Structure formats: C-alpha cells, structure tokens
C-alpha cells in the first residue's frame, strides 16, 4: 500500500495492477474527477483495475437547498453523480469495463459506524464528534442531513478495468 498525491502520482506508466480510491472523487468537480481518473489510468497496467467507493445520487441531483446543505455539512464542494454518471465518467476516461454496486449509505448511522469502524472506532468517532460544542453542532448536523437524505444518496463501488 502506498499513499501519494492523486493528481500527480510519482510512479511510472503501467506500474500497478490495482489502484484504490476511497471516498475522494465525490469531493471534486467533474473535470477534476476526470483528471484524477486519467492519472489512475496512466499508472495502471493493461488489464489493471481501479477500485473506487463514493457517494451516488439516486435521482439526477439533490434540490438546490439540499445540495447547499450537503456542501455545508461536509465542508467541501462535494459533487456526487448518478450511477450512470459514474459509469460514463470511467468509460470516457478510457476504461473498457465498469462493474458497479450501490446500496443504502450507512455514513453517520450507528449501525454503519460500528460495521465500518468497529465498536471501539465508532465510540471514538462519536466521542470526538460530541466532545466540544462546535464538534457537536457539526456532528449532529451531518447526522441529521444524511438521515433525512438517505433516499437520495447511496454508496457506489466501482471496479473499472483498463483494456489490455
């Protein structure tokens, strides 16, 4: 496992069989997403796989007020896409095959936190989220938002395959 700046990876072309991107592409505008994916494509060997996990809209997009709330609670100019939007993005960046799975997002749910982080990790996250008044305000705002928008937001996992 290696960590590097995703926009300028310090590796030669065709270096890796697998590149993993965890919940980061959503944080970028569509053009920036394409640039990052092109960089992942560059370092993948022919037949290599890009594995991503991100946020997906279940409809075309959130309402303007809801999108503004999402940006506010995450503190980033987040830009999720639909299932087809994610597929098109990877195909337009040169990948020959895109396998996808999506489902209910458990971000900020007690069950999801325990499953993803383990009991100790979940307790630590909740403790840190509630420790100060500012943390508590932001944590509860995120919790309420993701709970209220659960029908409009899913997780999506993609396995994009570079041609041989």
Regions found by a protein language model. Give the residues of each.
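A short SAM/SAH-binding and catalytic strip from SAM-dependent methyltransferases
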Residues: 17-32
């Amino acid at each position: 496992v290696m960590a590097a700046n995703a926009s300028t990876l310090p590796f030669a072309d065709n270096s890796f069989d697998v590149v993993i991107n965890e919940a980061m592409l959503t944080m970028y505008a569509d053009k920036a997403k394409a640039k990052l994916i092109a960089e992942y494509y560059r370092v993948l060997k022919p037949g290599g796989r890009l594995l991503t996990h991100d946020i997906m809209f279940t409809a075309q997009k959130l309402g303007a007020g809801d999108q503004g709330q999402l940006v506010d609670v995450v503190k980033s100019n987040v830009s999720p896409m639909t299932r087809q939007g994610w597929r098109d993005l990877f195909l337009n960046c040169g990948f020959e095959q895109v396998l996808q799975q999506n489902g209910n997002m458990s971000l900020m749910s007690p069950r999801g936190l325990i499953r993803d982080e383990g009991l100790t990790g979940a307790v630590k996250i909740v403790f840190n989220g509630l420790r100060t008044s500012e943390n508590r305000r932001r944590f509860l705002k995120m919790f309420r938002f993701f709970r209220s928008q659960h029908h409009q937001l899913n997780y999506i996992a993609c396995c994009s395959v570079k041609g041989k």
